[in-house]
Amino acid sequence: MISHVSVVSHRFLLGCAAVTACAIVLTVLLIVRLALRRREPRAGDRCADDLGDSRRPAARGRRIVLAALPAVLVCEVLVTGLVATRINMTLQLAETIGQISGIIDPQPVASSVLGPLSTGGPAGPSTTASPVPAEQYRADLEDEGSGLHRTVFHGPASGVTDEVRIWTPRDYRPDDGVAYNVLVLLHGLPGTSESVLSALDIGPQVQDAIDKGGIPPTIVVAPSLNVDEHQSADPDCADIVGRAKVGTWVQEDVPRMVHTLFPGTRTDRGGWALAGVSSGGYCAAWTTIMRSDVFGNAGDMSGYNVPIIGGLSDPALSADNTLTTLLTRRAHSPIGLWVMSAVDDSTVTDATRELIGAGGPGDRVDVTLAPEGGHSGTLWKEQIPAFLAWWGRRPGVVPGTDAPETAPPAPTAAAAQPAESRPPLPTRLAASFTGIRGKGVMTLMGLASILLTIACPIVPCRLRGVLAGAGGTGRRRALVLAAAGAVLLLAACALTTLTIGLVVNRIGGFYPTWSVAWENIGPAL
């Protein structure tokens, strides 16, 4: 099926590049042909052709634009898609055409009924006395090097079959007698298990924390949450009736599989933590509160307080599943929650501030607002050492350290302060025409791309008259017209792609500055 076609393969990229190149060449040839169909101008004629009245060049010019414009627009769409494909291959935000289709046009959640919570954990169901997991939780691991492993696993409890990626520290051996902690890492939307590991550079960062004694030996697990096309577009944290049982997948199947494959992993809640980015950050916090018998701590990076996607965002469920509400009203064992976002991330900054001072008896909620970074992989990667250091100090993370903590520190200055007042008009105008999210920049880019799009067929037509008056062979004229058409077409495609990217970035609130955007996207280009 076309929905299962991979969009991260080199074959797909080469196919897109070939189609785009063919479209550009054919469009340039069309533009040249339209220009060369015009007869030599007579005195008083401007850009006349042999098919119409020479006294009506404007009408004939419109016909040329209408003839070539669809081809130019197709090229712009193809170039935009090609650039997006190249970026996606590096960031691994979506893996198939079906995932992209679901993100663009998500289907509404058919149910607003929350299913029962899973009762299992790494050692098996809570009603099972034996800590030995069932044999059906075994899976075959593919060694990808540098401590990375991959498996496609079928969860017996959830019925979900999907990818899980696992990182093991240096010199890991199943029989080394070491008790390993487990950090479960959840990706956001869009995202994949591979993208979150690579974007956060998680292996080297966790290994460095282990080497420095900041955290005990730890295995990192990144399950895919794109368990079907619905979840790829509108992911859940919980088991929503009528949808895939993602909650059971994360809370029971993945932990049991990990403990089966890595028997040295701990089974107590102090040894297990969740962390996530964006929507995965909310899911990490939500799951830790709901299953505090399995997970003792969570890291919420650029997540939200009120659920805004998935089944929990339904009005019938969202109020009861807001994090601040769950922390104060939901019965749970004491947990630690590390919450972080950037001041310039308008999508979640207020949600982060709402969690200051939240928490029930025994909970520890630490809030940090980074001065900049937006909603980006660069920010999350930079903040991983801070999260790991925080996690390593939590009671129970190191076996035998269950003593109560001291009072939580005061939130960072940026987190404690309310949002800044609106800047003066000159500052806002400057930001509008220089900042990556500025409306002025996008307006100018949009107008320029429209003008270039229209100029693609018009300029060669005008240039044809100039070349005819200057003499020269027909072949030379055709080459000059082709070069002019190609330059204009490529410029129009580039400017249109940039304009679309700026609009998407503003809507998504991803990158607050040009430099942050280049840090994330530049390597892909």
Residue ranges with predicted function:
Residues 1-525:
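Non-catalytic cap/lid and distal C-terminal segments of serine-dependent acyl enzymes
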